[in-house]
Amino acid sequence: MKTNRPFARASIAFSLFALSCATQHAHAADWRWLNANNQPRPIAIQAAKQLVAADSDGLSPPDYEASKIESALAAASKAPLAPEEAAKLDEQLTQSVLRYANELHHGRIDPKTIRENYTPDARPPFDANALLTQALATGDLQPLWQAATPKAPMYEELRTELQRYLRLRAHPAWGSPLPALPKAATIRPMQEWPGLPLLAQRLAALGYLPASAPQDSRKLTPELQQAISSYQKHHSLKQSGLFDRATSESINITPTERAAQIAQTLERLRWAPLQQAQRMIVVNIPEYRLRAYTLYNYKAIETLPINVIVGRARSNPTPLFNKDMQRVEFSPFWNVPPSILRKEMLPRIQNDPDYIRRGNYEIVGSNGKKVELSPEALAGLANGSMRVRQRPGRGNALGGVKFIFPNNQNIYLHHTSSPGLFKRETRAMSHGCVRVDEPKLLAKFVLHDNPEWTEQRISTAIDKHAGGAVQLKQPIPVIITYLTTVIGEDKNLYFLPDVYGQDKLLQRALEKRPK
């Protein structure tokens, strides 16, 4: 990259100063943020304000020496700085702005350090140095901030919500904890409890009660019940309208802690490759939700929300990564993964020789041919030289369709032979793959560029267990991500449980990173 000459001279001047031999050689014309009188240009004040407000994007102002820079600029506005002080301030502001812009755009840590294995997307390269050089020439930092800000879905809405929670940090409603619940652990309609006035204050501060609503009643009124019900809906709680232990624990979480949770989602939106194609599929593990997006006027618009089932938290968590979907298989065979075969299925086959027939399974040798059940076949299954697969049909574990995005972890999207499981609120119950509730809708979205696959043909292929494999004309990015705060279809903010403990990992990584 071609270096701007004034910036190069400023860097040289500061390096010499650091060696205590540049004071007499430093010239105001070499500095970027100060004028000829060694006082701040307006653009320097703009930069300091942005750094001080870094927490509004989920970043940390102390990381950028924001207060120190703001104070130094304020002092320089009153009295010109000595040359060596001016050089030091100029360099500090340059480095802080560059660090802020890069961390705003790319994030603060490498996601692979917390088991989130994303391949960078094909977005245009972000060159903070070049954009800063241009900004200093024009006196306008807005193009730099705009280019640095992620364009990911939900980012701006979550940023707005973050600022709302930051404003609530000092709210007196969280100045003291709620009193202990009675032994029954649930406050019921019109029951009295001394904590209800404080609860009403918190619900009003969060927007669940009108500011004009009475906040001094010690009874659980219908109005307060409705507010509790709405709060429960947006915080992954059973929506009963009663004030129970889970709701108490949730609303005792302070606005500062909630702001940190939103900030973690903003950090993840900087990593996740959500800006790379005309159409994409995003699976959000904590939400048990799949969203399909289509790009309109350079903005990703959600076109399809679908409930999903994901991997069990302790034993089979669904990995977090991205790959391109390349084909769809109707009426797929289910090739039983070796771990499931070894740990779960082989003991059943050994104890019940009819298990293979009843489940519509077959044993397959290394040559791909079917093998009858025998002691030799059991030995082959045990040593891995043979495998088991389930034939297509009504009881097939994959249902009527499988969506394939090749990866080395054998993860894919598929339907299921047990659709009733989608009615459960907590749906971390698979062996790692992602089960989708509405496979026909997803197939229609995926096969958009394959016009011969009409809605009727898709339905027939799934319902009649016919069809085979279809290669997509245009691969579709699939991103399996982990966002514990989201903006729902109703435009409200939802807080989700940290089902895999990834938020805790991210928080530790942020605390340990170099300052």
What do the predicted segments below correspond to?
Residues 21-24, 208:
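Intrinsic disorder/low-complexity segments in short proteins, especially the signal peptide
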Residues 30-32, 118, 136, 143-515:
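Well-ordered beta-sheet/strand-loop patches within structured domains
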Residues 11-22:
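Bacterial N-terminal signal peptides
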Residues 2, 22, 33-36:
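Short intrinsically disordered, low-complexity coil segments enriched in acidic
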Residues 2-13:
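Bacterial N-terminal signal peptides that target proteins for export
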Residues 27-129, 133:
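Cationic-aromatic interfacial patches
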